[in-house]
Structure formats: C-alpha cells, structure tokens
C-alpha cells in the first residue's frame, strides 16, 4: 500500500466510524452486500448510506442520517453503509440493487429488495441539513 492509500484508509476509517458507531453495518465487499440483500426479509426496511470522503458527506450526509435514525419514531429494520471510493466492489454491487445513476454520498431506502426511496448527492449538497433530515424522515414515515 502506498502512502496515499494508507492516508485515505485512515481518513475513511474515521468517516466510516461516524456511521458504524451508530449501529450502521458496514458492507465492505461485494459478497457482503449480496449476502445481506439476498437474506433481507421481504417486510424488512433497509436504510443504505453510500458514504464518501467529500465535504458534503462530512457536513451534511452523515450527520443527517445519524440524526434521523436516532430521533425519528419510525425506523428502518436495518441500517447499512458502503463507502464509495474505498469499497469499490461493495459500492458497485449496492448500486446494482439501487438501479439509479451512481451518486455519492446518497441514501437509499428498501423494503425487502425493492427500492422505495432514493436521495442522490444533488439533493444533499448545498442544502440545509434540516431539509435533508426532513427528506429522510418523510421516507421513514412512509415506508418504515
């Protein structure tokens, strides 16, 4: 591993822990994503955060996701995350399930394996964090 990769891994570990420290399961390989999605119950809801090293992930996406997961009355059955740019195969596999234009950071909400709601980067970046929280809350209230 070169110095750049080591540095990015160190940063990603800290950024990943903002979610895993709040009970998000980190899916880091294509097999982990496939196994998780294959075994999810048809009535289970899964909130997916596609994490990123960018500023809008740090200042908006991760804090909004954590806030709503912790404070909303209706919650998804599962909370998982993949890390774009770090866990490339896992992210690509999750994007196969999402079937939307690749976007990071982003959020997806599934019921079973069916995508119910997707929030891409362009609906995160540059917006007020309260508005992002409301988008996530509305999706949870509708589908969880």
From Swiss-Prot:
UniProt cross-references to InterPro entries, sorted A to Z: BrxB/BrxA (IPR009474)
Entry's Gene Ontology BP terms: cell redox homeostasis
Source organism superkingdom: Bacteria
Gene3D superfamilies in alphabetical order: Glutaredoxin (3.40.30.10)
Pfam family, one: Disulph_isomer
Homology family: Belongs to the bacilliredoxin family.
Name assigned to this protein: Bacilliredoxin SSP1311
Biological source species: Staphylococcus saprophyticus subsp. saprophyticus (strain ATCC 15305 / DSM 20229 / NCIMB 8711 / NCTC 7292 / S-41)
């Amino acid at each position: 591993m070169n110095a750049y990769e080591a540095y990015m891994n160190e940063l990603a570990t800290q950024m990943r822990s903002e979610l895993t420290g709040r009970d998000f399961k980190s899916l880091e390989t294509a097999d982990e994503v496939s196994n998780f999605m294959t075994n999810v119950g048809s009535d289970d809801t899964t909130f997916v955060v596609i994490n990123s090293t960018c500023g809008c992930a740090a200042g908006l996406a991760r804090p909004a996701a954590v806030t709503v997961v912790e404070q909303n009355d209706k919650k998804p059955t599962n909370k998982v995350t993949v890390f774009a740019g770090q866990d490339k195969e896992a992210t690509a596999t999750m994007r196969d399930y999402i079937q939307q234009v690749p976007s990071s950071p982003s959020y997806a909400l599934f019921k079973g394996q069916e995508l119910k709601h997707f929030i891409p980067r362009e609906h995160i970046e540059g917006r007020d964090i309260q508005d992002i929280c409301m988008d996530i809350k509305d999706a949870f209230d509708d589908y969880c």
